[in-house]
C-alpha cells in the first residue's frame, strides 16, 4: 500500500539539559520512516534547501526525494527548548510552500509545520482522497518578534476528513471548546475520527462512542515527533485493517514505544514488532463510554 505525506522535512535544533543536538525532523521524516517500518510505500511531498545535509540518511531509511523537493531557500528550521514535559518552539527559517498536483496513494497524511500547505491544497486532497489524516498544527501557528511559536484561533474547513489529531490547545483554537465538548464540535464539522492527545492520555471519538487509553507513567525525555509517529501508525493500521479500535491501540502503542526509547530525534521511531506488542496490551485495557 502507498501513503502520501505532505509536510516539510525540517532541521531541528533540540536544546535539553544544557546541550543542543541538530537532527533531521518534521512529520515528513517521522511519519515517512514509521510508514516504511510498517511496510508501506511512501509518496513524499516536501521541500528542503541546500542546507539540508540529511538527505542521504533519510534515503538510507527508505525515503525518496523528488526533484520538486529541492529549493534554493533554506530548509525550515526550528529551535526546540525542552523543559521537562513542556517545550518552547522557535522558528529560525522557513522553506517554500509545497506544490501538490496529484497522487494515487491509498491514504494521505497532511501535517504542516508552518505555512507550507495552502488551503487550496487542503481542498484538493479532501476531494480526491479516500483516507485523509490531518494534523492542523501548521495552520494554527503564528510567530512573534523573537521567533517564538504561539497558536491563534483559526477558521478552517475540516469537513470530509477521516481523522484529525489535536492536543487540548489545538482543539481549543479550532473550536473555542475544551475536552469532550471540543471533540464533539470537531466531529460535527465533518471529522470521522477525532483523536485527542493530552500528554499520556489519549481519547478517540467515533460516532457516539469515546475510547480512552493511557500511556504508562514514565520519565519523559524528547517528545519531538511522537505525535507524527502516532499519526502514521494510526493511518497505516487503519488502511490495512479498517478497524478504528485497533488503529488507535496501534497509534498509542507506537507513541508509547517511541517514548520508552528515551532517544532524541529520529532514533526514537520504533519497529512494528514492539508497536504490535504494546497495541495488543492496550486493546484489552481500553475504556469505553457513550457521548
Where are these regions (language model features)?
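Short, conserved phosphate/pyrophosphate- and ester-handling motifs at nucleotide-, phospho-/glycolipid
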Residues: 35, 167, 227
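Conserved phosphate/ATP/ADP-binding segment of small-molecule kinases
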Residues: 141-212
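Short catalytic helix/loop segments, enriched in acidic residues and glycine
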Residues: 20-33
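Short glycine-enriched, charge-decorated loop/helix-capping segments at active-site entrances
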Residues: 17-23, 147-149, 180, 218
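Conserved N-terminal subdomain of the carbohydrate kinase-like
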Residues: 2, 11-22, 37-133, 276-291
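Active-site metal-binding loops of divalent metal-dependent hydrolases
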Residues: 7-9, 229
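Alpha-helix C-terminal capping segments
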Residues: 32-41, 237-240
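Conserved post-catalytic alpha-helical subdomain immediately downstream of the catalytic base
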Residues: 193, 216-286
Amino acid at each position: 500500500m502507498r501513503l502520501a505525506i505532505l509536510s516539510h522535512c525540517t532541521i531541528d535544533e533540540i536544546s535539553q539539559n544544557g546541550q543542543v543536538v541538530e537532527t533531521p525532523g518534521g512529520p515528513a521524516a517521522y511519519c515517512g520512516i514509521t510508514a516504511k517500518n510498517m511496510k508501506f510505500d511512501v509518496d513524499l511531498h516536501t521541500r528542503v534547501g541546500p542546507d539540508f545535509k540529511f538527505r542521504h540518511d533519510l534515503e538510507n531509511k527508505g525515503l525518496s526525494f523528488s526533484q520538486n523537493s529541492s529549493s534554493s531557500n533554506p530548509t525550515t528550521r526550528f529551535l526546540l527548548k525542552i523543559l521537562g514535559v513542556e517545550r518552547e518552539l522557535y522558528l529560525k527559517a522557513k522553506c517554500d510552500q509545497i506544490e501538490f498536483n496529484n497522487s494515487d496513494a491509498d491514504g494521505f497524511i497532511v501535517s504542516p509545520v508552518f505555512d507550507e500547505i495552502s488551503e487550496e491544497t487542503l481542498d484538493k486532497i479532501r476531494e480526491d482522497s479516500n483516507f485523509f489524516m490531518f494534523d492542523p498544527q501548521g495552520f494554527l501557528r503564528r510567530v512573534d518578534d523573537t521567533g517564538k511559536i504561539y497558536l491563534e484561533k483559526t477558521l478552517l474547513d475540516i469537513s470530509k476528513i477521516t481523522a484529525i489529531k489535536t492536543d487540548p490547545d489545538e482543539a481549543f483554537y479550532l473550536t473555542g471548546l475544551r475536552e469532550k465538548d471540543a471533540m464533539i464540535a470537531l466531529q460535527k464539522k465533518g471529522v470521522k475520527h477525532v483523536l485527542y492527545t493530552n500528554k499520556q492520555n489519549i481519547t478517540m471519538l467515533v460516532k457516539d462512542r469515546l475510547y480512552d487509553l493511557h500511556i504508562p507513567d514514565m520519565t519523559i525525555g524528547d517528545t519531538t515527533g511522537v505525535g507524527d509517529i502516532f499519526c502514521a501508525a494510526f493511518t497505516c493500521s487503519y488502511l490495512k485493517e479498517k478497524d478504528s479500535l485497533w488503529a488507535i491501540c496501534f497509534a498509542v502503542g507506537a507513541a508509547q514505544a517511541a517514548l520508552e526509547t528515551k532517544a532524541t530525534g529520529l532514533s526514537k521511531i520504533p519497529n512494528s514488532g514492539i508497536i504490535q506488542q504494546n497495541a495488543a496490551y492496550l486493546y484489552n485495557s481500553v475504556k469505553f463510554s457513550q457521548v
